[in-house]
């Protein structure tokens, strides 16, 4: 075993210990969804619950079956949560490198732990959130890591990938992301036009149709509208888009949105490394730099820009009519355009950058679509979970394309990430 392998295994051990420490602190909550689903089978059978739930509340058939069937077996989710994080991060490394890479996996794990705590608490460490957000995200990442592999796909790996669709395509955000990503790759990359890809897309379409065609979806929409946002069905398209963008705005300007700041930093590097940089590139570089400076000042508590501008609090009647709120929307939209510009220009030079470009676009789309639900605000921070994971994936991809050949730099970055995590505990 050479020195580099020993270093990689040492990093992996630290990552495992970090996840084990988190897993040891996990527990079922004695209220809300954890309480409901842990007792739901006391007066009914699993079969009857699933049929009734599909017809009256949700199309998440397989996820609900897995959740209510295993939630009272604590070892299932105590092991399943950290294992899903590992599968998710290992899949990110496969998408990034083209094969499993231990160091990129470890780096992904520690960057994952820097996703805003409120988002992780809702989408990853909360037991019900694990079944509905982390698990389908991990399944999506694995299935796409197989789909994105060039050349023929072995029948074992292909079967596992299709099996994962039975989880990822039974969650609204991951099902849309899976379908969109696979369609995008087939349209723009000829190497993915193969028999497995068409079987994959057909399977995803059928399962997604099963999810969205559930009779319970309409009933749930009516119930949630009455409970959380009466009159939502009569809101205009523009209003619903504003609701969705307000959640995007929140994700971008949260003081602890470290992952998105990392993406902005990497995109800034892409622009500055462009030898054919134009005035447009300089403008977006200035936008990204300005955003990073503002976020640093907000993070340090030096800058407080009011109740609306670069404030992560959600819309209320006061902010709805505030000019500074819409100015904040405008600035953050420029930041998003700056990220997309950097990736689009890079994709022209290097076709591989199509992947992070599409990941970022889809990530924002998964949040924007939440604006069409009356629970756009009631759902809390968990609706930002998939977005954060996709921003993490894009960041890892860009970092590897820029510095993948510099092992010492990767080692140093991993050490810094580990140290920062330890200090944040």
Regions found by a protein language model. Give the residues of each.
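Short hydrophobic alpha-helices at membrane interfaces in multi-pass membrane enzymes
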Residues: 149-166, 194-202, 407-413
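Signature aromatic-anchored transmembrane alpha helix within multi-pass, membrane-resident enzymes
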Residues: 157-158, 285-289, 336-337, 341-360, ...
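Start-transfer (signal-anchor) and selected internal transmembrane alpha helices
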Residues: 1-20
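Transmembrane-helix motifs of polytopic, lipid-linked glycan transferases
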Residues: 82-105, 142
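Transmembrane alpha-helices and membrane-interface helical segments
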Residues: 90-91, 142-149, 181-189, 265-271, ...
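Membrane-interface alpha helices of multi-pass inner-membrane proteins
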Residues: 156-183, 206
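Transmembrane catalytic cores of multi-pass membrane glycosyltransferases
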Residues: 23-76, 173-176, 190-344, 365-382, ...
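Membrane-interface micro-motifs in multi-pass membrane enzymes
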Residues: 109-147, 322-340, 368-395
């Amino acid at each position: 075993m050479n020195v580099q392998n020993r270093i990689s295994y040492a990093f992996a051990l630290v990552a495992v210990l970090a996840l084990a420490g988190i897993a040891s602190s996990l527990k079922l909550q004695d209220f809300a969804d954890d309480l409901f689903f842990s007792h739901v089978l006391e007066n009914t059978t699993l079969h009857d619950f699933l049929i009734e739930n599909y017809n009256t509340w949700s199309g998440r058939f397989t996820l609900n079956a897995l959740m209510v069937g295993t939630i009272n077996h604590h070892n299932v989710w105590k092991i399943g949560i950290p294992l899903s994080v590992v599968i998710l991060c290992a899949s990110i490394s496969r998408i990034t490198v083209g094969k499993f890479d231990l160091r990129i996996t470890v780096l992904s794990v520690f960057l994952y732990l820097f996703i805003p705590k409120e988002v992780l608490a809702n989408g990853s460490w909360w037991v019900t959130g694990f079944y509905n957000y982390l698990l389908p995200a991990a399944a999506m990442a694995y299935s796409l890591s197989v789909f994105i592999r060039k050349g023929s796909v072995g029948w074992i790996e292909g079967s596992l990938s299709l099996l994962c669709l039975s989880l990822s395509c039974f969650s609204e955000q991951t099902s849309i992301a899976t379908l969109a990503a696979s369609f995008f790759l087939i349209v723009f990359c000829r190497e993915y036009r193969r028999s497995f890809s068409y079987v994959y897309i057909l399977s995803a379409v059928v399962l997604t149709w099963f999810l969205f065609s559930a009779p319970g979806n309409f009933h749930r929409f009516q119930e949630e509208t009455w409970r959380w946002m009466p009159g939502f069905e009569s809101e205009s398209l523009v209003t619903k888009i504003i609701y969705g963008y307000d959640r995007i705005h929140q994700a971008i300007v949260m003081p602890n949105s470290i992952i998105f700041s990392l993406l902005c930093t990497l995109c800034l590097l892409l622009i500055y490394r462009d030898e054919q940089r134009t005035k447009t590139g300089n403008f977006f570089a200035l936008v990204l730099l300005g955003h990073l400076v503002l976020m640093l000042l907000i993070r340090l508590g030096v800058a407080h820009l009011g109740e609306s501008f670069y404030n992560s609090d959600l819309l209320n009647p006061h902010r709805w009519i505030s000019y500074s709120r819409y100015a904040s929307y405008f600035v953050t939209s420029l930041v998003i355009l700056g990220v997309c510009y950097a990736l689009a220009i890079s994709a022209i030079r290097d076709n591989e950058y199509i992947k992070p470009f599409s990941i970022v676009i889809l990530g924002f789309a998964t949040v924007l679509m939440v604006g069409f639900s009356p629970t756009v605000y009631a759902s809390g921070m968990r609706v930002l979970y998939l977005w954060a994971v996709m921003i993490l994936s894009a960041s890892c991809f860009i970092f590897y394309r820029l510095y993948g050949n510099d092992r010492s730099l990767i080692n140093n970055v991993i050490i810094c990430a580990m140290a920062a995590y330890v200090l944040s505990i």
